[in-house]
Structures are given as structure tokens and as C-alpha cells.
Amino acid sequence: FNKKISNNNLSKINKDIEIDFSNIIAPLSENLKNFKLIGKIEKGKFTKISAKGGFGENNFLDITMKQDKKNKKKYLEIYSDLTRPLLTEYNFFKGVTGGKLFYSSIIDGDNYNSKLKIENFNLINAPAMVKLLSLADLSGLADLAEGEGLSFDVLEIKMEKKENILILSEILALGPSISLLMDGYTSPEVTSLRGTLVPAKTLNKMIS
């Protein structure tokens, strides 16, 4: 009952807002400084956002969101010079270090279509990747993944959320040692992925 009252009160909020934080403690002790957000709320929900903050050493976070007045869809874009503070809550990205992150999403009610791109990153001590490489009889790369890590030039993920299921229509990772192409889905109960893993030496033989 109280929750219904709270939701009803929020749905009545219509105003422009401006937020200014001098310091926000982000995950993994990455402090976000001088974070400023200008936005617009209609019926209790954001319809416009423009935000920016800095992690220090010329590393920034930018967030923009706009709503199309005709179809009511929202268009969200996020850019970050640091990936880990934004991905640390997701087990799927465990082991990702370094790199720059680009994220775009078309939000339609509770559903969305999104693209995630990470450039120039390392994958270090990632249990899922180590297991995958071991099963593929690539023990040398598995050892590297547990130690110094595997470097990748780019990771691109196309995803679509419908109800409680996140459909991963394409996962593409390209690196000097190995490349991956996968698809699948994840839900609160299970994660299922399938695809192709190609070591660089195999790819070189195919090209030459």
C-alpha cells in the first residue's frame, strides 16, 4: 500500500533538475569527481539527461539521454574512459581491465535494444574464459589468461531485453592472440552462450 502511494507521488513529479556532486565513491575505489547532471523529469521519469564527471588523469564519464516526443522511445548514450567502475556489478565482465567504453541503448518502456563496445582492454584471471580455453585444448592461452591476461583490440555486444530475458544477438571480440564470435541469452535462472573461438595462429593460416 505504501509502495503504491510512493509510486503515485513520483508519477506526479514534473520538473527540470540540476545535480552537482564534488566527489562520488564509485566501485573499485574509483572516485568520480565534479559530477554534474542536468535533466528533465516528466511523470516521475527522466526524459532528458546530460551529465559529466571525471575520474582524474584525463579520464571522463559522459552520459546523455533524450526522448523522442512522437514514439516516446528514449535514446541513451554512455562514454567512459574507465570500464571497471561501470562493469564491476556484472559477473559476465569479471576480469575486464583497462579500455574505453561506449554504450548506446534505445529504451522502449521496459524493453531495450543496446550496443556495448569496449576498446583496447585486457582480460585477466577471468574464470569463464579460462575454462573455455581449457575445454578448447588451448592450455597455453588458458595459462596466459590466468597470469598476464589476454589483450583484445575490441569487444562488441549487441543485446536486446524482453521481459526478464536478455538476448545476446552478437558478441564479437578481436585480439592478437584469440578472437571470439558468440551469441546466447541470459536470465535470472540461466546463462547460455554458443559460438566460435579462433586462435590467432589458426586465423593466420586461414588468411595466408
Which ranges hold each PLM region?
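Membrane-proximal interfacial segments on either side of biological membranes
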Residues: 1-171, 175-208
